Amino acid sequence: LDPISKKLKNSNSQSLNGRKIKEDLSNILNKKISIQNDANCFVLAETLFGSVKDKYPKTKNVFGIIMGTGVGGGIIIDRKVIYGNQGIGGEWGHSLLLDDGDDCYCGKKGCVETVISGKALEKFYKKISGKKLKLEDIYAKKDNDSHAKKTIERLINYFGKGLSNVVNILDPDVI
């Protein structure tokens, strides 16, 4: 949520961007509600109650990654969520990855999300193979389909490049 306008932004469910979703839901449900970014909730829960707490109990600085139809992230510093001035702290999915990449709904081109999200990888596979497949099916064919292999190699290569920028900036204890 934009901290000033209270409107949703940077959602890969683009029809929700620009909406006062918290206010809308509160009015529809006639209840007070709270809304948070999924990546922030995930990384906070893992840090305080989940696998980070279990395996690295003294950890204070964590970067959590959400990947699916979109690409997002959450930052924990000193065991607190970092929202940033505009409420988009951790949103590495909108960091530049390819200068000549596809347009992103955020208004930029070549964002991480336009390269390694599930949707982006399915689009890439279709472009090089002419076939439309879901990412799980592409992955299942990676050993006997050269286009599927190339798609998964693209994911691995660009995931590493994108994440290396986060690591160099944040230097988290755990990802």
Give residue ranges: language-model regions.
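Glycine/small-residue-rich loop that forms an oxyanion/phosphate-binding "nest" at active or ligand-binding sites
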Residues: 34, 40, 44-46, 55-60, ...
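Short glycine-aspartate micro-motif
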Residues: 62-66, 72, 105
